[in-house]
Amino acid sequence: RTGEKVETQRLYDGRWAFVAENIPALSSEVYQIVSKKKSSRRFVSMIAENKILNNGIVRVEIDEGKGTISSFKRVGDSYEYASNSGLNDYLYTGRYASDPQGIEQILNIRVLDDGAVAATLRIESKAPGCNTLWRDVTVYKGIDRVDICNTLDKQDILDFENVRFVFPFNIQQPEIT
């Protein structure tokens, strides 16, 4: 594989991303990032309407009112994996789950990355118990996975409290094993 070129992308935070394909388990491969002229090839955007991520394998849609994942499907499959209330919802309660509260306001939904390798949407929200809540949702080219990174700028609250992120999947007759 020496000299084989792979797509690279500089992410919003300065890190580099690329997809390392066909690496057997418990093995390794060495990649080197070298500077070159900017590629003239255009990549296909994985973001639509600033609320939909689609890498050709999975499609994720963000609810603009709650910031949850309102739709989660495999491309070409009509089955909806997200329940009606949406995935990655924020739930804040007092001790013993008293006084449940959710997202107060979506401040903005913005594109962090949209390149040849990865696409990320950031949902910034006003949420109880937090100064700010950021929920980043990422898809990668050619990978059937969605990454979620939730970051809380937590308020200094001395009372008992619970913070949860809930993922109610649309599963008929779920069985816990």
Predicted regions and their residues:
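Catalytic and substrate-binding regions of extracellular carbohydrate-active enzymes
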Residues: R1-I157, V163
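Polysaccharide-binding surfaces and accessory modules of carbohydrate-active proteins
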Residues: R164-T177
